[in-house]
Amino acid sequence: MSKEENIELTGTVIETLPNTMFRVELENGHQINAHISGRMRKHYIRILTGDKVKVEMTPYDLSKGRIVFREK
């Protein structure tokens, strides 16, 4: 799957779950479970409840996503 097929949305972290999973509320009101991308894990970027994040989602499963950027 190429990078162009992924859907990129913004949202807010509303809950921290075990195993570096987060519940994110998207701007359109939907809630999804998301995990941290490997690059964010490598650079020890911390994500807290209330942070604005960019989430990448695949069109095949719209209930899961990958956090790729934490906005300041």
Swiss-Prot record:
The keyword Cytoplasm applies. The keyword Heme does not apply. Residues 1-72 form the S1-like domain. It is found in: Cytoplasm. Signal peptide: none annotated. PROSITE patterns: S1_IF1_TYPE. GO terms for molecular function: ribosome binding; rRNA binding; translation initiation factor activity. Component of the 30S ribosomal translation pre-initiation complex which assembles on the 30S ribosome in the order IF-2 and IF-3, IF-1 and N-formylmethionyl-tRNA(fMet); mRNA recruitment can occur at any time during PIC assembly. Belongs to the IF-1 family. One of the essential components for the initiation of protein synthesis. Stabilizes the binding of IF-2 and IF-3 on the 30S subunit to which N-formylmethionyl-tRNA(fMet) subsequently binds. Helps modulate mRNA selection, yielding the 30S pre-initiation complex (PIC). Upon addition of the 50S ribosomal subunit IF-1, IF-2 and IF-3 are released leaving the mature 70S translation initiation complex. This is Translation initiation factor IF-1. It comes from Dichelobacter nodosus (strain VCS1703A).
